[in-house]
Amino acid sequence: EAFATKFAIPHVYTDHRRLLERQDIRLVTLPVVTSLHHTLAVDAADAGKHIIMEKPLTGCFAEANALSRQAMFEEATKNADAVVEACLRNRVILGYAENFVYAPPVAKLRRLMDASGGTLLDLRAEESHSGSHAAYSRRWLTAGGGSLLRMGSHPIGAVIHLKHYEGQRKTGTPIRVKSVIADVAQLTKTEAMRKEPPKWLVTAWEDVEDWSAAILTFEDGTKATVLSTDVSLGGVKNLLTAYLSNSVVQVNINPNSTVQAYAPDGEIWGDEYLTEKVETKAGWQFPNPDEDWMRGYPQEMEDFVDAVREGRQPLSGLPLARETVEVIYAAYISAQE
């Protein structure tokens, strides 16, 4: 109640089901910890509410060594299917908040794909930074995985989306992932890292990975390579390169060179925000003039609301959400084996 008062939030509930009983609410957003995603989504769908779902759609939430990765795959896909079935059963729309899909640089890539008519042969994508500060992210029990799931869901979702888009544009059928190979590691737990002060990287990981790499093979034989790590200094990296049969497109969501600034002392910039997760404001920086817009946050909200209003599916919805979970947990199987 104190939080609600501070931010002028008119209604407070201690049970989400009470909120879902309200007849004046048509659409709910679920910005909650990953372990609550699928249960809240099913409850919302059963209440007839349309849903905006944070990434990833769901996962398997257990101690990292309690189950085999195959068992985790089965649990995660079961949870995902429960959400899909609830949405279909209740005829509600789920907007999957994969902002890479809506980022203006990726939207431009789609238009360039349309113009060129080329085939996507090789996709290379990354999201990396110096580590999450959210305590729940450090345990498999609450997060469902480490960097491969928590951050990898962004670039993996993006490359899946682009191949879906290509297939639908050319043949009317999305091109799906056929297989995946992957590796993961806990690089901040290495002996050399343990001995090294100061720690510029987050090191409080318990049983989740802080480094991951995956190679996806699609049904048409084309490839995507995805990196997701918590061992990358210098701010958030949201990058994608598309190698087409007749062109190359480099997408820089973060960092990008729309604004470049230099200061010998970080204090010169005072409290002015530069960009997310930089360890210092000194030296050359890449201040984003409108970080939310460049990452696609307003655009995804607009599409989700319009989809509900118009009774259509959003650009990023259940098919992408479901396949992303399937691919990531298949990647965990590969990494274990």
Map each language-model feature to its residues:
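Hydrophobic residues in well-ordered beta-strands that form the structural core
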Residues: 13, 53-54, 94-96, 226, ...
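C-terminal helix-rich "cap/oligomerization" subdomain common to oxidoreductases
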Residues: 27-29, 69, 89, 290, ...
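Beta-strand-loop-alpha-helix segment that lines the small-molecule cofactor/substrate pocket
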Residues: 26-27, 38-99
